[in-house]
Amino acid sequence: MKNGRWILLISIFFLLLLGLCIGQKDKLSFWLSSLKEKREIENQINSMNLDEKVGQLVISGFKGETISEELKELIEKSHIGGVILFSSNIKDSNQLIELTNSIKDINSISDGIPIFISVDQEGGRVSRLPKDIEKFPSAAHIGDHGDENYSYKVGNTLGQVIKTFGFNLNFAPVLDVASNPENKVIGDRAFGDNEDLVRRMGLQFMNGLRSSNVISVVKHFPGHGDTKEDSHYELPYLNHHKERLDAIEFVPFKKAIDDGTDGIMVSHIVLKNIDNKNPATMSKAVVTDILRKEFNYEGVIFTDDINMGAIANNYLLRDAVIKTIDAGVDVIVSSKGVEDTKFIIEIIKDALKKGDISEERIKESLNRILKLKYKYSLEDKKLSNINLDKINRFINDNIK
């Protein structure tokens, strides 16, 4: 009997030891993988010229449903980090596939760094998918549904559908708390007027997108749900103190960070009691002190469209670009078109030469951008034509 107990104890000891060794091996494998990634990114950055480095910091919109010579040149020579597509770029499903394939084809012979092909496909009234694709529900509809599993399923289904068309990054979900009924710019784009509901539904939607290997960029930090003004046209101000922001507006974003969100879009909103001179996109107090230091966020930070009225009607583009990068933002999103993007790139290059922006600051953002592209194994692989009936059936079977 005693011998049996000793044998049992010794067996348990060796099993624990084996488990510890396996655990240490897993940790070692993870560490070696991380080290390899870090070295590859460092080598990539060290091999890049100025145009390649600066270009990665910009996502550009463009006009038309095909690749113009100007856009081709922007991808080939300016090495932009990504493009963003809107409804005006999309005619139908076949045209969209041809367009994203063309973008990848041009980029693949450019610098070897895969390109972000992005969209802000939220569902509901913010829909960029071709008209021959079944509609996705709004965030408000998902919030009314109240089922976290449903939110995850919608996010996952959406991710798989947009990936079929060549997109690898989606500026969604909206994590704003719609606490102001007079706010029409957000409204049904939010999951609800309660921070806990927004947190629960938003995080599941985000995780659903990520599970389909699509990058999810949550928005619009620090929270656009209680503003009177629409930042598309004018500069909104929020009078809330930090305590209120921590209790409501910041809640979904903090939880998204805890859940490992890969991207956060910062909005053009002035938090008067934190930085009364600068919108959040241009505020070091918001981007660096709160997002980076207080919330320990290490992912990629994107601007809302820098051409929106909140910025264009109040700031010179040069000042806005320099202050945005100095604040700690990684990627400037510019929807206006190729010429505007080229101007932004020249502003950054000129600021580097004059010392208004440091090379180290650019390298910090570049490291985060490349790390994200590495994490999702982005590639410029062309896609085959889609089966429209199969896609619509997939949507209906999963979320209708």
What residue spans do the PLM features occupy?
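A substrate-binding/cap region within the structured catalytic cores of diverse enzymes
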Residues: 139-167, 172-206, 210, 395-398
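Short acidic/polar active-site loop segments enriched in Thr and Asp
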Residues: 81, 168-169, 262, 330
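A short aromatic-anchored loop/beta-hairpin motif
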Residues: 60, 79-89
